[in-house]
């Protein structure tokens, strides 16, 4: 289940609670892209998506020193399993309740735009869940999906496809092999 709150009133307290409880009772993983003012609606969600600015804002609100401290405090407070932070040029970081922090750096030199970044990451995470991928591989897949968006020329006509993702992963793999030489 993917819950994405655009602040239009569709994801309200009662509805979110019902969806989350039903999904959890059937062991269906939940991915959420919450409004920072609606974090209370995400208690018990498996995967939460933030952009780096959101984590920085929460760090200040919580009065902690680092983004990592803020992430772990949010995970504990809201009973999340994972907090995925999308940082554009800095890549993707996944903070987890029971695992080490994983970071996948962005490999692009030319970032063109960020519209659709969270949606692309949510889809990548859903695919990773369906394939039982590790948190590390989930970070790599989410980062590849984000790089497809970050490198796209035109967002209004760009649709993230399986082929785009395969091509991006191939490029990332090639770059990694070349850098190890």
Predicted segment positions?
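Short acidic, glycine-rich surface-loop motifs adjacent to enzyme active sites
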Residues: 1-10
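Short, ordered loop/turn segments at secondary-structure junctions
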Residues: 6, 35-37, 53
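Conserved phosphate-binding/catalytic region of the ribokinase-like
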Residues: 13-29, 34-44, 59-61, 65-181
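Non-cysteine beta-strand/loop elements that form the S-adenosyl-L-methionine
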Residues: 45-53
């Amino acid at each position: 289940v993917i819950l994405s709150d655009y602040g239009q009133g569709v994801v309200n307290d009662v509805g979110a609670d019902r969806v989350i409880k039903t999904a959890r009772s059937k062991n269906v993983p939940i991915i959420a892209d919450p409004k920072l003012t609606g974090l209370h609606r995400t208690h018990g969600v498996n995967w939460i998506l933030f952009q780096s600015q959101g984590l920085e804002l929460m760090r200040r609100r919580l009065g902690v020193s680092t983004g990592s401290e803020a992430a772990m405090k949010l995970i504990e407070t809201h009973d999340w399993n994972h907090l995925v932070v999308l940082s554009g040029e800095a890549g993707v970081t996944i903070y987890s309740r029971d695992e080490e922090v994983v970071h996948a750096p962005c490999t692009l030199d030319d970032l063109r735009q960020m519209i659709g970044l969270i949606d692309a990451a949510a889809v990548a995470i859903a695919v990773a869940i369906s394939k039982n991928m590790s948190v590390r591989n989930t970070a790599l897949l989410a980062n590849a999906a984000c790089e497809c968006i970050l490198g796209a020329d035109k967002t209004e006509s760009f649709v993230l496809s399986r082929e785009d993702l395969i091509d991006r992963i191939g490029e990332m793999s090639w770059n990694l092999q070349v850098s190890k030489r």
